[in-house]
């Protein structure tokens, strides 16, 4: 069983690498590095390598490795844990979104897609990472991971808190999608200065400036919602996992906002964009973990108040 968890952990790490590499492709405008050719690069296995081709083809290799590991985990789970429906669904979810992600990537190469569609590419990559992470978490629960008390899962979560966490997850996904759209639109610098946009409290609400400003407003509300979640969770003395998860979510959200503020202040480069992507991926991972913790585990006893 430890071998299965090791493979699942490797899959999670490769998924994270694929997310970051995809951000590298977008940030460096290397999506056309292999031309209109897929799965080959410029119509061959060994093209004339340039920077864009290396970045794009490297992303394909990492994504293919993620796909192979997802298949391995899915088959392994089905064979050794056939009675655990939730675990099998998580493993299948990983495989499903990897295939969907690969198909969307291939479509983008073979036929140019609008920015609204291209933004889905990053959103699906986050879901790939999410399911891979939760498979690893689920496998670790049987071994009583070090960050949990043995009795922690015996304390169910009140419906109000569950709704709060899942609502934040859905809202965050929409804000992330909007951020991906801003990047594909080339509007990351449409608002200069921070926190004002081009020196205005309310800039024109259309075009690249409007999209960028909408993302800022969405992120600001996300901060408020994360603060509310942390304030609620800090009182849950029976659930150390929820309290720590909410604290991590708050810390990562604060870092994410700071990294986003670097763009309009003149620090828009590959490093800061990868940092921004890495932080939101980490935040999303923590939030997904919190969602997982709200799922019922066995018989409910005493509800945790929100």
UniProtKB/Swiss-Prot annotation:
UniProt entry keywords in alphabetical sequence: Cell membrane, Disulfide bond, Heme biosynthesis, Iron, Membrane, Metal-binding, Oxidoreductase, Transmembrane, Transmembrane helix
Reaction equation(s) it catalyzes: Fe(II)-heme o + 2 A + H2O = Fe(II)-heme a + 2 AH2
Top-tier EC class: oxidoreductase
Ranges per topology, Cytoplasmic: 1-5, 78-89, 138-164, 228-247, 299-306
InterPro entries to which the protein is assigned, alphabetical: COX15/CtaA_fam, COX15/CtaA_HemeA_synthase, HemeA_Synthase_type1
Disulfide bonds: 34-41, 191-197
GO molecular function term, any single one: metal ion binding
A Pfam family per the record: COX15-CtaA
Pathway it works in: Porphyrin-containing compound metabolism; heme A biosynthesis; heme A from heme O: step 1/1
Transmembrane portions of the chain: 6-26, 57-77, 90-110, 117-137, 165-185, 207-227, 248-268, 278-298
Assembly mode: Interacts with CtaB.
Domain notes for this protein: The N-half (TM1-TM4) and C-half (TM5-TM8) domains are connected by an intracellular loop. Each domain is formed from four-helix bundles and they align in a pseudo twofold symmetry manner. The N-half domain is the substrate-heme O binding domain and the C-half domain is the cofactor heme B binding domain. The cysteines of disulfide bond Cys-34 and Cys-41 may be involved in transfer of reducing equivalents from quinol in the membrane to the active site of the enzyme.
Family label: Belongs to the COX15/CtaA family. Type 1 subfamily.
Protein name as it appears in the record: Heme A synthase
Highest classification ranks of the organism: Bacteria, Bacillati, Bacillota, Clostridia, Eubacteriales
